[in-house]
From Swiss-Prot:
<keyword id="KW-0057">Aromatic amino acid biosynthesis</keyword>
<feature type="binding site">
    <location>
        <begin position="91"/>
        <end position="94"/>
    </location>
    <ligand>
        <name>5-phospho-alpha-D-ribose 1-diphosphate</name>
    </ligand>
</feature>
<dbReference type="InterPro" id="IPR005940">
    <property type="entry name" value="Anthranilate_Pribosyl_Tfrase"/>
</dbReference>
<keyword id="KW-0028">Amino-acid biosynthesis</keyword>
<comment type="function">
    <text>Catalyzes the transfer of the phosphoribosyl group of 5-phosphorylribose-1-pyrophosphate (PRPP) to anthranilate to yield N-(5'-phosphoribosyl)-anthranilate (PRA).</text>
</comment>
<keyword id="KW-0808">Transferase</keyword>
<keyword id="KW-0822">Tryptophan biosynthesis</keyword>
<feature type="binding site">
    <location>
        <begin position="84"/>
        <end position="85"/>
    </location>
    <ligand>
        <name>5-phospho-alpha-D-ribose 1-diphosphate</name>
    </ligand>
</feature>
<keyword id="KW-0479">Metal-binding</keyword>
<feature type="binding site">
    <location>
        <position position="81"/>
    </location>
    <ligand>
        <name>5-phospho-alpha-D-ribose 1-diphosphate</name>
    </ligand>
</feature>
<comment type="pathway">
    <text>Amino-acid biosynthesis; L-tryptophan biosynthesis; L-tryptophan from chorismate: step 2/5.</text>
</comment>
<keyword id="KW-0460">Magnesium</keyword>
<dbReference type="Pfam" id="PF02885">
    <property type="entry name" value="Glycos_trans_3N"/>
</dbReference>
<dbReference type="GO" id="GO:0000287">
    <property type="term" value="F:magnesium ion binding"/>
</dbReference>
<dbReference type="Pfam" id="PF00591">
    <property type="entry name" value="Glycos_transf_3"/>
</dbReference>
<dbReference type="GO" id="GO:0000162">
    <property type="term" value="P:L-tryptophan biosynthetic process"/>
</dbReference>
<feature type="binding site">
    <location>
        <position position="167"/>
    </location>
    <ligand>
        <name>anthranilate 2</name>
    </ligand>
</feature>
Length: 337
């Protein structure tokens, strides 16, 4: 543990670790060989200074090396966010994932139970009847038969148990809040990736590029949502074959009305499951609008739509045809088989 103490002294001094040093430090953290006091001091020092891109790359590499992997079809994507926007919005990315899968794109959704909201992806899917915590072979079957799977973070990142008590004791978010969304167990290389802090957007996009992602839209709503919002514009950093570009999405430009944050607010898992089901049954609402907007982005990132407007139209069609409702029904059936 002398090496970890050296890394701890480095970050405590305000200096940054190299990519290799960060990988070694997080290997130690995730192995359970670091004391709680050392772990807390290390995570606090990183948070106070702000994590460098090399430190994040090293940390993600350590996470990915320990995760339980899932085999996914070529071209599978994820729609995921860092969380932590404290908006209380309903499960936008979960519904967007269902709509995207209903349009023929494999979605390997990675998520967890609620951290700062009342209902995380895992919570609402359980309320809808989906069995979570499945082994990799069952998840591969979900992808094959339903076009969609849900990879429960606690199942795939067991090493996180070593730092969970320390994270619970710290009254602020740490680097681990961004590591989960960057560590998809299916190894997808295309993502719609929401961030709750605008300062994270470009660095984390570059991190994904360094780690092999091919096509990414990193999004942050003007209202703070870690989604493409319908209350106003959303800033997007797009990664395409190693190059980054910046643009803004206005929902009105793809035929969707503006909403308020109150319109998008959710509740507990049962409330959100009922709202999601209503959208799949054809209900017109702000919930539907933001879901088709984010699904449209997923289709563009997957290469299944040439423009956002085309993607939104396809997502609308998946609801109206009943394909999205059928996709969820298949996921429920296959996950419980």
């Amino acid at each position: 543990m002398d090496a970890f103490k050296t890394h701890l002294a480095t970050v405590a001094s305000g200096a940054a670790l190299s990519r290799e040093q960060a990988r070694a430090a997080f290997d130690d953290l995730l192995s359970g060989e670091v004391t709680p006091i050392q772990a807390g001091a290390f995570l606090t020092a990183l948070s106070v200074r702000g994590e460098s891109e090399d430190e994040i790359v090293g940390a993600v590499s350590a996470m990915r090396a320990r995760m339980l992997p899932v085999t996914a079809p070529t071209g599978a994507i994820d729609i995921v966010g860092t969380g932590g926007d404290h908006s209380g919005s309903y499960n936008v990315s979960t519904l967007a994932a269902i709509l995207t899968a209903a349009c023929g794109v494999s979605v390997a959704k990675h998520g967890n139970r609620a951290a700062t909201s009342r209902s995380g992806a895992a919570d609402v899917l359980v309320a809808l009847g989906v069995k979570i915590g499945l082994p990799p072979e069952a998840l591969a079957r979900c992808l094959s038969e339903a076009g969609l799977c849900f990879m429960f973070a606690q199942t795939h990142h067991g090493a996180m148990r070593h730092v969970a008590p320390v994270r619970t004791e710290l009254p602020f978010r740490t680097i681990f809040n961004m590591l989960g969304p960057l560590s998809n167990p299916a190894g997808v290389t295309a993502q719609v990736f929401g961030v709750s802090r605008p300062a994270w957007a470009e660095p984390l996009t570059r991190v994904l590029a360094t780690l092999g992602s091919r096509r990414v839209w990193t999004v942050h709503g003007s209202d703070g949502l870690d989604e493409i919002t319908t209350t106003g514009p959303t800033a997007v950093i797009a990664l395409e074959d190693g190059a980054l570009s910046h643009f803004t999405i206005d929902p009105r430009e793809v035929g969707l009305p503006l909403a308020t944050l109150d319109d998008l607010r959710g509740g507990d898992p049962d409330h959100n499951a009922a709202a999601l089901s209503a959208v799949l049954e054809g209900a017109r609402s702000a919930y539907r609008d933001i879901a088709v907007l984010n699904a449209g982005a997923g289709l563009v990132v997957a290469g299944a739509a040439g423009t956002l407007a085309e993607g939104v139209a396809r997502a609308q069609g998946a609801i109206d045809s009943g394909a999205a409702r059928a996709t969820l029904a298949r996921l429920v059936a296959v996950s419980n088989a």
